[in-house]
Amino acid sequence: DAKTQIKMHSTAGEFIREVEFPGIGSASGFGGKRTDTETFYSFSSFATPPSIYRYDMLTGNSKLIRRSNAKADPEDFEVKQVFYKSKDGTRVPMFIAHKRGIELNGKNPVLLYGYGGFNISLTPRFSISRLAWMEMGGVFAMPNLRGGGEYGEEWHRGGTKANKQNVFDDFIAAA
């Protein structure tokens, strides 16, 4: 659902566990040899600056190794993923991020950002300008419009050529 999810399996294909991340966000950089018992990854979210973690594959624990200098406390913000219906009834995911404690009553300024094209996936990533927006009481909303790569080729084709109107309908429905 447009956020990183990692499931660990044995070399025989048996499910071991799901990797837990510090929140809804994007992780990358996993790698290693078959004999390694740890790996490193980068994690970032709307409220978490890029951070490097060490993941122990034996215990399933992640340990923060390094975080960028951006002055942001992820605990000060709330990030959630919701789903809404577009004009044609298609279920579309959207991330909503804001400062913790803000009442979402329709009176908050909202920055609605979307892109639905060229099979490009929009995932939760850190941005200092979005963080400043949320610090000042703004709400950041990012729908995953058809045309992107979040759900594979069918989702991508659903927002291209003769289906391009779906991208605009998805965005309007998000508002």
Task: Name each model feature, range by range.
Residues S10, S45, S86-D88:
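Short acidic, glycine-rich loop/turn motifs
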Residues D1-A2, R66:
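Peripheral terminal and inter-domain segments
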Residues F15-E20:
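A short beta-strand motif characteristic of beta-propeller blades
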Residues G25-G32:
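Repeated scaffold domains used in trafficking and secretory/extracellular systems
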Residues A2-M8, A47-R54:
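Structural motif
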Residues M8-S10, F43, R54-D56, H98:
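Residue-level signal for short segments within beta-strands and strand-turn junctions
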Residues D1, T35-S45:
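Short beta-strand elements that form the blades of beta-propeller/WD-repeat-like
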Residues E14, M57-N61, I65-A175:
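Cap/lid segment of the alpha/beta-hydrolase catalytic domain
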